[in-house]
A protein has these predicted regions:
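Helix-turn-helix
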Residues: 132
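Active-site acidic-Proline motif in GNAT/NAT acetyltransferases
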Residues: 93-95, 99, 127-128
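Conserved GNAT acetyl-CoA-binding A-motif
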Residues: 113-124
Length: 165
């Protein structure tokens, strides 16, 4: 039986683990920045929350699969509306992709959110993130709108997708 754990990132060692995940996912980060991710990018991701969101709604976690740290998930509860989860980041190391692990981990998260009585999950995917779009479509997410969001490089078109759970 697969064992999945979400680990709170609350010390420098765990921040370095998160950075390691970022560095091993160059496909995604090349879409949003010309620079390699740094520890300050990790720290920024850990603390950044939209206006009006409480700190207890923010969940930035390492993903451990059978005792191996291989991903990061960052999500907000009850955002942008009550009973909705917004996943802001879900990445798996490049060398661990295409093995069904992302799907197993997402199903674990989905079940956990459903058990906590959330009704839907929302995500935003860069238009040019073909790997991400393919993954989320396989998880039965449907496009609800498109918008432009500011990233380090520039404004980028994002496809907002949603799934009822």
């Amino acid at each position: 039986m697969d064992m999945i754990k979400l680990i709170s990132v609350n010390n420098d060692g765990l921040k370095n683990e998160a950075l390691n995940i970022y560095l091993k996912n160059d496909y995604y980060f090349s879409k949003i920045s010309d620079n390699l991710p740094s520890i300050s990018a990790v720290e920024e991701d850990i603390k950044t929350i939209p206006n009006g969101v409480q700190k207890n709604q923010k969940n930035y976690r390492l993903i451990s699969f059978n005792d191996e740290i291989l991903g990061v998930v960052d999500f907000l509860t009850d955002y942008p509306e009550k009973d909705t989860i917004l996943i802001g980041l879900f990445i798996i190391k490049n060398d661990k992709q295409k093995q069904g692990l992302g799907t197993k981990i997402f199903r674990y998260l989905e079940k956990s959110f459903k058990n906590k009585k959330f009704l839907k999950i929302r995500i935003g995917v860069l238009v040019d993130n073909e790997i991400g779009l393919s993954f989320w479509k396989k998880q039965n997410f449907k496009e609800i709108e498109r918008k432009f969001l500011k990233f380090e490089k520039s404004k980028k078109e994002v496809i907002v997708m949603e799934k009822e759970i």
